[in-house]
Amino acid sequence: MITYPAEFNARKEAVFTALAQVDGGGHRLRFPMLSFRDFPQTQARVVASLSRAKKQPKGRLGAALKRWLVRGQYNGARRYFLRHPDRVAVAWNGLGGSRAAFLQGARDAGAAALHAELAPFPGRITLDPVGVNAESGVPQGPEFYTDWAGQDPQRSGD
């Protein structure tokens, strides 16, 4: 069963709904899980998540509030996945901000985590346990693909 934060984008929500159906069910988190009892790794995870956040807070108050929110989300996700280690955390992109804190909380609790993203092929989605784009688990260089294609004559195409 997958667990994923609610998305306010119909396409992303449809991807998670379909994935949940294939995986035998899903738990959509309408609101972020929050906990303010820290783990030893909390501060480092918050700093890492915020350093990559798309929307950086403006001013000291905004930064403090964002740190507080991401801290609560990391701790909340970690506690949730400690209680549900059989669930798989899935988030769109998940390299920065709240989604990164969610996925890292799951990983630190021992649960599996997947990053979802549009694939380089039309109409396809990538699910990757490592990351997305240049940080994905997909080989980046052409050597892997040419070696793979060379192993079977039917794999060489136009």
Question: Can you say where each PLM-predicted feature lies in the sequence?
Answer:
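A general secondary-structure boundary signal
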Residues: 1, 105-108
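Conserved N-terminal ligand/cofactor-binding loop architecture of enzyme catalytic domains
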Residues: 1-78, 82-83, 118-158
